[in-house]
Amino acid sequence: MARDYPKEFEPIVAKAKSLGKPMRVAVAAANSENILRGVFAAEDDGFVKPILVGNEDKIRAVVNTIGEGGRELDIHGVFGGDNPVQYAIEMINSGDADTLMRGNCQTRDYLLPVLNKANHLIEDDALVTHVVFLKVPGYEKVLAISDVTLLINPDLAERKQVLLNMVDAMKILDIEHPNIALLTMVEKPCFHMRDTVEAQTLVAKHKKYPIADCNIAGPISYDLIMSKEAARLKEYDCPYCGEFDGIVVPNLMAGNLLVKVLMNNAGAVGFGLLTGAKIPIAISGRSDAPEQTYLSLAACAAKLVK
């Protein structure tokens, strides 16, 4: 696989490669072509040791299909009604793996075992969120967006935790004091739009008692987030317009659609990871390019670097 990704992500890969030893990744339902291409590229670059979990015959068939039949494989066969995601999690809990990667399984089937507190990947009071990092053409900075998979309609407390998780995740890019936007449809509080009122409340709380080491603005619409000129024309007084590092979205539909539109129609390139668990967890779609899997794994490895 060609290492074809924006130069802005190079610090993440460099940090991943500085990990003292390869990160042991349990790939659940590993019979996925593009997932394995990304996993094997990370292995070749020295920061991943893959453990392939699932139906062995299907895994070997995919490995042969992508031209990797000569590669030494560590396969853990799972048969019948056994859940490969659950098996992979048990490997982590037993100390035989460091993190988890989604393979050829539905998002729901991957996330439910991860979120199950009985599986010990999450502290009792923790909230797991999905952060996506994008390089959008025409926008100078890497842009983090969350939450895009887990929280259907987050309340004020949950949006605060989304923000905290995002700020923590941004450290893989050495961003220590990011500018965070609380996305809403309009830039003024409106009683009929709960998210605008909560954004105003969150900003007010942050000004009085800082929530995290970051700057926060909101409520703010997407055009103002991305453009200083739009802010000037609409007389929106915020020094961070056009220079935001992250966007906290109001709900799952807004976040998921925003990411998909930017990636499918605007040429954005990026990756995601799950944050808020005891370990960083990789996640990539089955139709995603191998580079997205590679970068998600690099981000997890970078998080493990002390």
Roles of regions detected by a PLM:
Residues A2-Y240, F244-P250, A254-K306:
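Anion-binding alpha/beta catalytic cores of soluble intermediary-metabolism enzymes, centered on
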